[in-house]
């Protein structure tokens, strides 16, 4: 069962959205680098990483032919439910499903039927890829903050990259292991 998602407005919409996200990301990263107020820095970094999730979403859903090799999604030898529980993924999952972020992607929640399991399994791959793209973009911001000796901005950047990209990637892999052990 293959499910495709159409992006509103087609390729032009995606290009315009990318352009807008790029401009916003640049100004947010500059503001993060220059601010001395920690709470403002924290809020700006959150917005910056929320934008990186947008890059991943629009790239993956607009251009599904550029997918990652299926080998990437296969369970690795070291992966088990215990491994992910040790990393705190179950704790993260419980916090996520009780937060406002649960409203962002309603497609990923099962509706109690076996027919939805395949759709959910494929959706975990889409979500993981979107967050992987965000994680890689976040690494660029880490390098930029390090190059400018903005270590407080770097620490906020690392925190949000972990919470908004790395842990969601781990959660998607954890969910696939639960579905197909």
Protein language model annotation of sequence segments:
Residues 18-21, 132-142, 158, 162:
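Hydrophobic alpha-helical transmembrane segments of multipass integral membrane proteins
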Residues 23, 27, 58, 140-147, ...:
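Structural signature of transmembrane alpha-helix termini at the membrane-water interface
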Residues 49-65, 162-174:
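Transmembrane alpha-helical segments that form the membrane-embedded catalytic/substrate-channel core
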Residues 119-149:
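Transmembrane alpha-helical segments and their cytosolic interface motifs
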């Amino acid at each position: 069962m293959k499910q495709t998602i159409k992006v509103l407005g087609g390729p032009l919409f995606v290009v315009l959205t990318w352009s807008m996200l790029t401009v916003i990301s640049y100004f947010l990263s500059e503001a993060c680098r220059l601010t001395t107020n920690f709470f403002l820095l924290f809020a700006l970094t959150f917005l910056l990483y929320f934008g990186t999730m947008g890059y991943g979403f629009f790239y993956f859903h607009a251009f599904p032919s550029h997918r990652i090799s299926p080998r990437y999604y296969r369970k690795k030898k070291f992966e088990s439910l215990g491994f992910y529980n040790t990393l705190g993924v179950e704790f993260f999952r419980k916090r996520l499903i009780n937060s406002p972020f649960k409203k962002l992607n309603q497609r990923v929640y099962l509706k109690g039927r076996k027919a939805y399991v395949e759709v959910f399994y494929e959706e975990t791959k889409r979500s993981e890829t979107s967050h992987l793209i965000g994680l890689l973009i976040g690494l660029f911001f880490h390098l930029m903050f390090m190059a400018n000796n903005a270590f407080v901005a770097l620490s906020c950047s690392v925190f949000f990259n972990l919470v908004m990209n790395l842990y969601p990637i781990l959660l998607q892999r954890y969910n696939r292991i639960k579905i197909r052990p």
